[in-house]
């Protein structure tokens, strides 16, 4: 500040200031402050010339003389005009930016079409499908990388193995005889502790063989036991031997007859015995639903009850499995058909409702009370006693399916 300068400096430079008193009056205050801030006594250039508090007047006098001579070339106020500091410029730019944002857009620029170009409602309504194979990626025993392709291939093979109504041409075999045979095959599977896939495949082999061959009733048990033998070789790690199947038939057939029937079945089916079965789809769909073992077992019970019923033999295995799981979920009050189940099964809930009602009717009114192998099997503690679960009331079932 000019006040901080000593009085000594003022007295030493007083004669020079008196030489041009008129100039001192003409210098504006901004000029003085600018010149004072421009050069300080401590600067290298201000060393030789000691100036007083008004020492800039001499320079101002000189500047006025020069500007008087070169008035047309240089503007007199050019040196006094200074650019605002950087913080002030930034602040002004920020204020101008806010003002420009507050301005309303021109009338000719459409604003609403931008909302129409990106609709929000469809994006919110996209169903979330869970990747159920993500957790098992890299597991060589799970083959998660090919799981979807495998089941898509099985869905394609369903078309090839759809059963016609073959009972019309079987003169010596009835639906009740078939039901008795399947009930006996369930006991064989349980006694030998075979996989469920073995039982389902054996029933499929019997049905497809009877489509092509007209058989007599005295050979029906031989066909069933041989079908279990073939299915065991296809599904089991350690299948039972031929003598075991002769024993369960109470030695009603000879070894040569069993081997001859095995050859006949394989040749009749052209050795194409990889038939899609409901149980494989059921395990897949239960994984999609994150169902517990108890819920899966209830769905197994529902699905296995259909094996001895001829009317369900012509249903698609994937649809039968999906309907059994949906009925089990409804009976347990665990929700309905999720987008993940719809994606992996290929069926929406409305496609399954008629079959679900039929399955619930089957649990409520069993056609033959003498065939209790499946109910006895699933009444055990190992299977959570799911056979004792009370079937749903038909009216309540319809209400839950509609909701």
From Swiss-Prot:
<dbReference type="GO" id="GO:0016538">
    <property type="term" value="F:cyclin-dependent protein serine/threonine kinase regulator activity"/>
</dbReference>
<dbReference type="GO" id="GO:0005634">
    <property type="term" value="C:nucleus"/>
</dbReference>
<protein>
    <recommendedName>
        <fullName>G2/mitotic-specific cyclin-B3</fullName>
    </recommendedName>
</protein>
<dbReference type="GO" id="GO:0051301">
    <property type="term" value="P:cell division"/>
</dbReference>
<feature type="region of interest" description="Disordered">
    <location>
        <begin position="102"/>
        <end position="122"/>
    </location>
</feature>
<dbReference type="GO" id="GO:0000082">
    <property type="term" value="P:G1/S transition of mitotic cell cycle"/>
</dbReference>
<keyword id="KW-0131">Cell cycle</keyword>
<feature type="region of interest" description="Disordered">
    <location>
        <begin position="1"/>
        <end position="86"/>
    </location>
</feature>
<dbReference type="InterPro" id="IPR013763">
    <property type="entry name" value="Cyclin-like_dom"/>
</dbReference>
<comment type="similarity">
    <text>Belongs to the cyclin family. Cyclin AB subfamily.</text>
</comment>
<dbReference type="GO" id="GO:0005737">
    <property type="term" value="C:cytoplasm"/>
</dbReference>
<dbReference type="InterPro" id="IPR039361">
    <property type="entry name" value="Cyclin"/>
</dbReference>
<keyword id="KW-0539">Nucleus</keyword>
<comment type="function">
    <text>Cyclins are positive regulatory subunits of the cyclin-dependent kinases (CDKs), and thereby play an essential role in the control of the cell cycle, notably via their destruction during cell division. Could be involved at the G2/M (mitosis or meiosis) transition. G2/M cyclins accumulate steadily during G2 and are abruptly destroyed at mitosis.</text>
</comment>
<keyword id="KW-0832">Ubl conjugation</keyword>
<dbReference type="InterPro" id="IPR048258">
    <property type="entry name" value="Cyclins_cyclin-box"/>
</dbReference>
<dbReference type="InterPro" id="IPR046965">
    <property type="entry name" value="Cyclin_A/B-like"/>
</dbReference>
<feature type="short sequence motif" description="D-box">
    <location>
        <begin position="51"/>
        <end position="59"/>
    </location>
</feature>
<comment type="subunit">
    <text>Interacts with the CDK1 and CDK2 protein kinases.</text>
</comment>
<dbReference type="InterPro" id="IPR004367">
    <property type="entry name" value="Cyclin_C-dom"/>
</dbReference>
<dbReference type="Pfam" id="PF00134">
    <property type="entry name" value="Cyclin_N"/>
</dbReference>
<dbReference type="InterPro" id="IPR006671">
    <property type="entry name" value="Cyclin_N"/>
</dbReference>
<dbReference type="InterPro" id="IPR036915">
    <property type="entry name" value="Cyclin-like_sf"/>
</dbReference>
<keyword id="KW-0195">Cyclin</keyword>
<keyword id="KW-0132">Cell division</keyword>
<feature type="compositionally biased region" description="Polar residues">
    <location>
        <begin position="7"/>
        <end position="25"/>
    </location>
</feature>
<dbReference type="GO" id="GO:0000307">
    <property type="term" value="C:cyclin-dependent protein kinase holoenzyme complex"/>
</dbReference>
<dbReference type="Pfam" id="PF02984">
    <property type="entry name" value="Cyclin_C"/>
</dbReference>
